[in-house]
């Protein structure tokens, strides 16, 4: 594996981890009825950004799914 490939894999793992963490935090806020708070909306924006990155990876054949 080249250095570039290793860095890509690290970045992909970071994005997947962040996506899972943001999703979990959103679920907790939603369960508490706090889905209209600024914190929830900020998490939603982060989740959508991460999701768009993952979709680009998928569209270019770099990952199968997330």
Description of each model-found segment:
Residues 1-66:
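Extended, charge-rich alpha-helical interface modules
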């Amino acid at each position: 594996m080249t250095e570039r490939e290793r860095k890509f894999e690290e970045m992909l793992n970071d994005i997947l981890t962040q996506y899972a963490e943001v999703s979990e935090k959103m679920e907790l806020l939603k369960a508490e009825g706090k889905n209209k708070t600024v914190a929830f909306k900020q998490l939603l924006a982060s989740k959508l950004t991460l999701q768009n990155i993952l979709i680009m990876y998928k569209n270019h054949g770099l990952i199968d799914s997330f």
